[in-house]
């Protein structure tokens, strides 16, 4: 019997989590909460408009820890990080809500979103419509669907639920087969290419570059994971990828928003540093 991968362990835990949560708060109660939540802020629209201008459309991630790296940021105040990101030029935010593997929390999403005007994606491992409705009830504007964690029927069901409650969908792939499935099953314009293999946690930017020619022009390619320096950003921009999801590079910086600006908007950093002479 093979040892389950990290992703397989996470997914197994998610099914338990849904059972536990739905025993405490019914789907009907969640649906009522979702209807009374703040209106969605237009996650996909914000990214598409920025990328059309050939400007970096950055989804800045708020993430305390990961299974592969452990705790990434000790000084973790989601609202402060969100404000820093907004000042640094982020287009959207991503907030980890997985408790067991990423030390996330639902309240982190609420705190971050309340502190800024940016759209927010709930970054978690979606396996059941309950979690989608829960995301909207928490105030999320978008949800993540990870193709390697779902079959096509479930993927379509979750996307339909997202549409029903007014959420955008970011579909995540990390190889050609997953991309084909995503394009066939979903009509979301947001296609994230995760450069990190979720089974091995190895990272390669070539994953995005290899899949890019197969992503239709009417979809927005978003490169995820492994963007660590200016050269990585320039490599993507040369290949006409203007949308990025970045977490760790920012989370390890003392001021995440300043690091975002340094990586993606270096000209603005120079202007801020050079003061006019009296």
Curated annotation (Swiss-Prot):
Pfam assignment, any one: IGPS
Bilayer-spanning residue ranges: none
Gene3D superfamilies assigned: Aldolase class I
The species this protein was found in: Pseudomonas entomophila (strain L48)
EC number of this enzyme: 4.1.1.48
GO molecular function: indole-3-glycerol-phosphate synthase activity; phosphoribosylanthranilate isomerase activity
PROSITE patterns linked to this entry: IGPS
Keywords: Amino-acid biosynthesis, Aromatic amino acid biosynthesis, Decarboxylase, Lyase, Tryptophan biosynthesis
Stored InterPro entries: Aldolase_TIM (IPR013785), Indole-3-glycerol_P_synth (IPR045186), Indole-3-glycerol_P_synth_dom (IPR013798), Indole-3-GlycerolPSynthase_CS (IPR001468), RibuloseP-bd_barrel (IPR011060)
Annotated catalysed reactions: 1-(2-carboxyphenylamino)-1-deoxy-D-ribulose 5-phosphate + H(+) = (1S,2R)-1-C-(indol-3-yl)glycerol 3-phosphate + CO2 + H2O
Annotated family: Belongs to the TrpC family.
The encoding gene: trpC
Pathway connected to this protein: Amino-acid biosynthesis; L-tryptophan biosynthesis; L-tryptophan from chorismate: step 4/5
GO BP terms: L-tryptophan biosynthetic process
Listed name of the protein: Indole-3-glycerol phosphate synthase
